[in-house]
């Protein structure tokens, strides 16, 4: 499920917005998607550490 969401965010961020003012909403959505994608990328190592710690605890 996460990989599907990540692929959608990549596709959303790859769309280039036109310089017209009515595309401002799409630029905001693109920026939000970029922030979410960056957050997922930064959280990856922490999730791996938690998973390995949980495995060691068993």
UniProtKB/Swiss-Prot annotation:
- Source domain of life: Eukaryota
**InterPro entries, per database record:** Cecropin
Report the record's Gene Ontology biological process terms. Answer: antibacterial humoral response; defense response to Gram-positive bacterium; innate immune response
Induction / repression: Induced as part of the humoral response to a bacterial invasion. Transcripts appear within the immunized fat body.
Provide this UniProt record's keywords sorted from A to Z. Answer: Antibiotic, Antimicrobial, Immunity, Innate immunity, Secreted, Signal
* PROSITE patterns for this protein: CECROPIN
Q: Which gene encodes it?
A: CECB
- Origin species, per record, is Spodoptera litura
Q: Which family does it belong to?
A: Belongs to the cecropin family.
* Coiled coil spans: none
Please tell me where this protein is predominantly located: secreted
Q: Respond yes or no to whether keyword Acyltransferase is given for this record.
A: no
Q: Where in the cell is it found?
A: Secreted
Gene Ontology CC annotation, any one: extracellular region
Summarize the protein's role. Answer: Cecropins have lytic and antibacterial activity against several Gram-positive and Gram-negative bacteria.
Supply the name of the protein: Cecropin-B
Renumbered to this chain, the signal peptide range is: 1-21
